[in-house]
Amino acid sequence: MSLRGVSARLLSRRSGLRFPRFPRTWSSAAAHTEKTQIRPAKSSRPVFDWKDPLILEEQLTADEKLIRDTFRNYCQERLMSRILLANRNEVFHRDIVYEMGELGVLGPTIKGYGCAGVSSVAYGLLTRELERVDSGYRSMMSVQSSLVMHPIYTYGSEEQRQKYLPGLAKGELLGCFGLTEPNHGSDPGGMETRARHNPSNQSYTLSGTKTWITNSPVADLFIVWARCEDNCIRGFILEKGMRGLSAPRIEGKFSLRASATGMIIMDSVEVPEENVLPNVSSLAGPFGCLNTARYGITWGVLGAAEFCLHTARQYALDRIQFGVPLARNQLVQKKLADMLTEITLGLHACLQLGRLKDQDKATPEMVSMLKRNNCGKALDIARQARDILGGNGISDEYHVIRHAMNLEAVNTYEGTHDIHALILGRAITGIQAFTVGK
């Protein structure tokens, strides 16, 4: 499906969802800054627009803008109204997956199988808008699109693609990705999950435990990576209800509370041979999935950072201390300038990386560089915004503290800040530093 085709689909689907209009509150005003600010008057001289400092808008295609704007409306009108209580009560709304499937934004870069087939930049713009609301919602979308649909599309058989991708694209099926284990986070090569082949009945028996798995408590499908008897790493498609398979929820999170996180416990789960992903047999499989997901994260975290910047700016303009707005304070202006600079540079780097991906010129090191940079900078921006809000900054009604808490997790998962530094260090020096003496 062409970009223009998916744009039309997004718009036509939107009317069917009948988005309600919610009264504007101060806490959501910053998210709508772009709608409420007066555009500079046209003149013969260029005028600096702080909302788009290096004119990113002109580098996007008409279809990319339309896709983004349509999804932005959905996120602000349907999701922003739910997130406060969802985060406060640690509730994941399954209906959101159906709604996103209706909009066509799940697995959006995949061509065929009910997917939209949009550009990598369009996908990045979608994650940016979603994480502007909440990192937990974006995490769900990233897992579904990059860690479940991508491996089935890239490493799966045609039968597997036909069987699973249409349902995943519609949101009828929700998936999760099992790689991290209790004793193996940054070192997936040490995984203890085992798959034993049973030639007599053409199946595999999986045993092991995965943890910190987004979507697992509510998942219908489980993409699980296990070490086989030949020492190869293979991917398996497990289905909810298989004997010996359970996915208990992890309770008490202070981050990503609007998404469901849990474990995958496999007690001699029998999986038919037809559920093995046939086109990969090494860690290149899960790493390829993670690189795809990390790309979406590089855009997404900047959406959260933008929300924090806009909220802090509006608060500094409205808040009067010592008879003047906080925004008159030089230290506050410096913080806002630093935030704007980092967001702008990050967005343009994301755009370049997206164009390179669509030309098959992107490398894992490029993704690591931006995942590391943008996550770290977004977390710093959220912390600075919370500081500008003073005591109000710790109230969830202003949303900034929620973004800060979420970004603590995002800066850690799918490769920590330091692990990505080692990936880059290896590329720079030619020497791996993940292990000592090897």
UniProtKB/Swiss-Prot annotation:
Summary of subunit composition and partner proteins: Homotetramer.
Residues recorded with modification N6-succinyllysine: 51
Tree of life domain: Eukaryota
Metabolic or biological pathway, per its Swiss-Prot or TrEMBL entry: Amino-acid metabolism; lysine degradation; Amino-acid metabolism; tryptophan metabolism
Protein name stated in the entry: Glutaryl-CoA dehydrogenase, mitochondrial
EC number(s) per entry: 1.3.8.6
GO CC term, one of those recorded: mitochondrion
Top class in the EC scheme: oxidoreductase
Protein family (similarity comment): Belongs to the acyl-CoA dehydrogenase family.
Location of the active site: 414
Cofactors named for this entry: FAD
Compartments reported by the entry: Mitochondrion matrix
Binding positions for substrate per the UniProt entry: 138-139, 186, 287-294, 415
Binding site for FAD: 177-186, 212-214, 319, 330, 387-391, 416-418, 434
Reaction equation(s) it catalyzes: glutaryl-CoA + oxidized [electron-transfer flavoprotein] + 2 H(+) = (2E)-butenoyl-CoA + reduced [electron-transfer flavoprotein] + CO2
GO biological process, alphabetically ordered: fatty acid beta-oxidation using acyl-CoA dehydrogenase; fatty-acyl-CoA biosynthetic process; L-tryptophan metabolic process
SUPFAM superfamilies: Acyl-CoA dehydrogenase C-terminal domain-like, Acyl-CoA dehydrogenase NM domain-like
